[in-house]
């Protein structure tokens, strides 16, 4: 219906319009719009636009890669910090356990101190009653000590001149005597103490600076309590062979164990 209306309207308009002269389009001048130049500029624009797009795409890719690297670094930092936190937590827990242990030990020490203080008070209470008895026995003790010192000096002076006996024990105990780097020390070195290796050596250093002899160092290690027992026998008898035989027995026992 709309089509019929437009057709009838166009026909009526043609009938009502007066005739005209030549066509206006034929009278327009011939104008050169420069389509070739426009096409060339469009091509250049397209090339620049494509280059811009490519550069933008490359920049976006670079930024995305950089972003991924930054994220990876942040994740690694987070992992390291988490590990550091775990280490700190472990150390904190260990430290707390140590503190608790020290507190328990402190309580035990306080209990022991209180017990010792009580014992001390008991000893102090009986001290006055013992003073009289101590005074009575002091003279006797001094007399006995003087006799022991005299005997010890005599034994020591005799032992210095008993070289043949010392040579005998050196030979029979597979022993040699060396200097220990100090004027008041002697080093006694044994062999044939290890059944698996007769050449293996065992030694100890004897300190002679005081009246009572002492052993400072020995290899292999032996129990100090056993060494003290040997030293007690030596200091009581003042016979060096007691020490030489006793220490060799301790070394043989240590090698077997």
Swiss-Prot record:
Residues 1-23 are annotated as: Disordered. The keyword Nucleus applies. Keywords: Cell cycle, Cell division, Centromere, Chromosome, Coiled coil, Kinetochore, Mitosis, Nucleus. Residues 1-15 have a biased composition (Polar residues). It holds the Pfam family Spindle_Spc25. It is found in: Nucleus; Chromosome, Centromere, Kinetochore. Residues 57-143 form a coiled coil. GO terms for cellular component: Ndc80 complex; nucleus. InterPro entries: Spc25, Spc25_C. One of its GO terms (biological process) is chromosome segregation. Belongs to the SPC25 family. Acts as a component of the essential kinetochore-associated NDC80 complex, which is required for chromosome segregation and spindle checkpoint activity. Component of the NDC80 complex, which consists of NDC80, NUF2, SPC24 and SPC25. This is Probable kinetochore protein SPC25. The gene is SPC25.
């Amino acid at each position: 219906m709309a089509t019929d209306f437009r057709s009838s309207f166009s026909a009526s308009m043609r009938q009502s319009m007066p005739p005209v002269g030549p066509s206006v389009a034929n009278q327009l001048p011939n104008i050169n719009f420069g389509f070739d130049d426009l096409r060339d500029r469009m091509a250049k624009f397209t090339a620049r636009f494509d280059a811009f797009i490519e550069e933008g795409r490359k920049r976006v890719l670079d930024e995305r890669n950089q972003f991924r690297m930054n994220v990876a670094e942040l994740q690694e930092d987070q992992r390291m910090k988490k590990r550091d936190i775990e280490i700190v937590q472990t150390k904190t827990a260990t430290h707390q356990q140590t503190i608790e242990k020290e507190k328990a030990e402190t309580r035990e020490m306080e209990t022991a101190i209180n017990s010792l203080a009580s014992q001390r008070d008991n000893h102090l209470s009986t001290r006055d009653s013992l003073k009289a008895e101590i005074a009575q026995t002091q003279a006797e003790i001094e007399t006995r000590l003087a006799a022991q010192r005299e005997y010890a000096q005599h034994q020591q002076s005799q032992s210095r001149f008993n070289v043949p006996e010392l040579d005998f024990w050196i030979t029979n105990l597979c022993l040699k005597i060396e200097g220990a780097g100090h004027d008041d020390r002697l080093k006694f070195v044994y062999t044939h103490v290890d059944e698996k290796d007769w050449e293996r050596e065992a030694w100890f250093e004897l300190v002679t600076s005081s009246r009572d002899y002492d052993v400072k160092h020995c290899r292999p290690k032996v129990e100090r309590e056993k060494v003290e027992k040997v030293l007690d026998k030596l200091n009581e008898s003042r016979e060096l062979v007691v020490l030489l035989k006793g220490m060799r027995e301790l070394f043989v026992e240590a090698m077997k164990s």
